[in-house]
From Swiss-Prot:
Xref: SUPFAM superfamilies: Flavoproteins
GN (gene name): atnL
Name the record gives this protein: NAD(P)H-dependent FMN reductase atnL
Function text: NAD(P)H-dependent FMN reductase; part of the gene cluster that mediates the biosynthesis of the meroterpenoids arthripenoids. The pathway begins with the HR-PKS atnH that catalyzes two chain-extension steps to form a reduced triketide, which then primes the SAT domain in the NR-PKS atnG to initiate three more cycles of extension to give a linear hexaketide corresponding to the polyketide part of arthripenoids.
Disulphides: none
Species lineage: Eukaryota, Fungi, Dikarya, Ascomycota, Pezizomycotina
Amino acid sequence: MSKIALITGSTRTPRVGTDVAAWVLDVIKSRPEDKLQVEPLSIADFNLPIYDEPVMPAMVPAMKQFTKEHSKKWSEAIQSFQGYVFVIPEYNGSMSGATKNAVDYLYNEWPGKPVAIVSYGTQGGERANKHLSESLELVMKMKVAPTKVTLAFAPGTDVFAAINEGVLGEDTRKAWTEAGHKEKILKAFGEVKEILEQ
């Protein structure tokens, strides 16, 4: 059975990313799946500093050649999956530094694997989604699902709760459902599955 990592890209505290990722995971698991196992993975759990290995990631052909324990653990975790779903915030018009740093830590673990991208933010994180998609497809040589999911918080108190308390509000959950985002997530995940089956 192939394994898919659902990667939470935010590392700040508090962060709503864990709630968003849990919501996405619930959506994916709402459709019975017998060929793919989806597991949550949080970048924050790896405590990655700004890249500090002595060689470029592309020059590390094997995980054992990393010199730092955090690099080895991150490489080993990513290598163990056959595909990915990134759940990322938008910071200042792009992906978060933590997301970019985590992606850039590795190279040989990524190419050829399928990935879907779900972004979120006050306006849905469209630019973060686009920038990560370009990085993964053009540089890391991954196969990016065509369907991109952008989730905007409901206006008012939900925005405050998301940004300042790390809480995903009920109005936002309802708005995402009514806007058809659950269906888009399932479509994007289906595209990941199709790529794996090719």
